[in-house]
């Protein structure tokens, strides 16, 4: 079980590395620079990531992941459908994150000591991802409607709730968002904004 759990935790890094490669390719960054920004500790090793930097399209990337039987192939394909004509990678990135976190949280549904520690850690990571996503929507008001932004909330029963997420995404500005969070579990962060 420990090996399976470790593999699921490393799946998050595979998702991170895949998103890094996609962003690097989108920015036309040199391959060496893209690879230097990855942490190949999971299923996608250095060789696989280097190969993905050479794949020319998102569809070809999906095909490559499927050929390799990567666990990220299915969520990548689903995210790719959401990208559609817009070419906006956020839908694809969200599908990868949702899958990686959901798989790991499902694996730690037990009540053992190790599972509790890992579950709390995963919830912290999901809270962080939700907080940063809400801030992005606050910053990029025109990017998505509140309903669309709400679809990107990752469920993990963490301390940063859907109500917190909606409050931040709908705030007037960052200071207002932090003021709304003053009586929440992330009040220390909220207190850094005067």
Q: Where in this protein do the model-derived segments appear?
A:
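Extended alpha-helical surfaces
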Residues: 1-194
